[in-house]
Amino acid sequence: MKYVYGFLLLLIIGVPTFVFMPAPIDSAAYDPPSAPRLTGAFTPNDALKETELLAAGLVYGPEDIDVDDEGRIYGGTQDGKIIRILKDGTVETFAETGGRPLGLHFDSQGNLMVCDAWKGLLSIDAQGVIETLSTEADGVFTNDLDIDAEGIIYFTDASHKFHQPEYKLDLMEAKPYGRFMSYDPRTKETHVLLKGLYFANGVALSENEDFVLVNETYRYRIIRYWLKGEKAGTHELFMDNLPGFPDGISSNRKGTFWLAIPAPRNATIDNLHTRPFLKDLLAKLPNFLLPKAKPYGLVLALDEEGNVTESLHDADGVHINGVASVQEHAGYLYMGNLHRDWVGRLKL
């Protein structure tokens, strides 16, 4: 009987303490649109099951991928390394940032530009020497980038409040802490182009570089920011109500954008968004008790008008899931991820 009393006492003391203890977030209400059905262009298929898993078991969380002129594959991993996969499959360390490298892209001089969530915007030369380009604009979560023909780097800061390990808190708080910025290597100046984005993520320039796309992961949408023409300096909705959380996006500079969706929409999360009090309570729980993403592999091909021209799936997520980035190179798609131990390669 004493154990029953002890349990009741624990409940009497513990529950009010949990309820009234300060929450790590101050969440806002948000009523998401109903998730689209997976029909038409979104119809599931098994295309991603043909993906070859490179360096399986030898890398962890290579979030973004790029390939150099010699066909060597680069990715930034959870332990702060930029790994390089040689043609024979050998994995070596190209550089160590000491942070969490996320988006990366080669410039025209062969330098690897890296968005490091902790260190800012970095440049790494062919010898692996690291130079910090920008830590300005009070960013704490540098995320993804693309580079135009003049060398200007367009990049995102996902959140100016939450660091990379706290991305689920940013999701639940549902407030616009993200920014979209540019860095000019000639003047070494950083400019904030857009504020008030809901987890600013993937960045991709159009074929003619007249506009750039920016993913808002936690609003299931893509924003178009105009760089040239009458609309230069303005932005508009490019695509809305996606079937999952948009992460990385890239352009093949031939009119096609490749969009990575690491997780499908989650009805529990969508329903919680209308109940800020419950979100604040959940945010007090350990990370392993928070809602989990359903394993699913999904990559979308988009044209420059925002139409889905192709979708690639692994519907049961057994072979490949959690795709965070996708890059087209020499007839293949290369795919990265946040928490898996491979680099994906799929022949087009």
Task: Name every feature range the model reports, one short phrase each.
Residues M1-L348:
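Sequence-structural signature of mature extracellular/luminal beta-sheet repeat domains
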